[in-house]
Amino acid sequence: MILSRSLARIGRHLLLGAAALAALAAVPAQATMVRLHTVLGPVDIDLLDAEAPLTVANFLGYVRSGAYANSFIHRSMPGFVIQGGGYTWSDANGAIKVPAGPAVKNEFSSTRSNVRGTIAMAKVGGNPDSATTEWFFNLADNASNLDNQNGGFTVFGRVTAPGMAVVDRIAALRVVDADPRYADALDNMPVMVMPTTAWRRENFVMIDKAAELPARESQTESDRVFNYIEALYPQYAAPASPSSATFDGYYYRYYAATNAYLGSKNGQLYYLVPSLSPDIQPLGSLTEWLAAAQMAGY
């Protein structure tokens, strides 16, 4: 019954959520959105295609090649940054460095400052043009530091409000010195649980995959709302980004991990959790949900 009551509260909280999201800066309609499928839920990033084109192209190259699949967050500095993009993991082979392509030219600009909720490229100390695979999320306003060293760190995207809730959950995890074989690369690593013997996948904050979401203008209104709800309530809509389908007039997505459905029909949004009730439950107006999703960047 906890799941049922919680889902029912989603609709009642819609207007409060929309009011909070209204304070966020508008996202350009043409911005590319990338979803990192983490073990704690999706982290959605609106890329600054026009402002940092070389850096965005570099990042998308790794996303599209699958380089970030089975990677993990390898550094957490609470109140500062969390960092990923550097290593993949398999229980058979351990941590493996993500293969790096050519370094990208630094595109730092003071108009894209290292403030909370942004993603920026990591790089080698003393070399402004050395960014390759690794990136970090700013947990705080770090402009006074990161804007003023090593040529400035290039911000190339902004995390959506639901995505930052996931980032904050990662930042709240225990941090350990995971593996001295990697020098200082894994000496501030967040862990889901401590290993009892050998390190295994379930110990890491894994990123199962990274993928572009379809362009907003190519999505249905329902799909935009589904993407938003998946990010806002990952505990109920998992795994995120399943295919949409139709049945009996409903346009819906099925979430296998939670055995739940989200659907729309005749301008209304619905959910169904068969294990709790055979009845389809209303969540409110699709138009209102779309307004909240749009303000959040979806």
What are these regions (language model features)?
Residues 2-16:
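Bacterial N-terminal signal peptides that target proteins for export
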Residues 13-25:
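Bacterial N-terminal signal peptides
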Residues 29-298:
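Cyclophilin-like peptidyl-prolyl cis-trans isomerases
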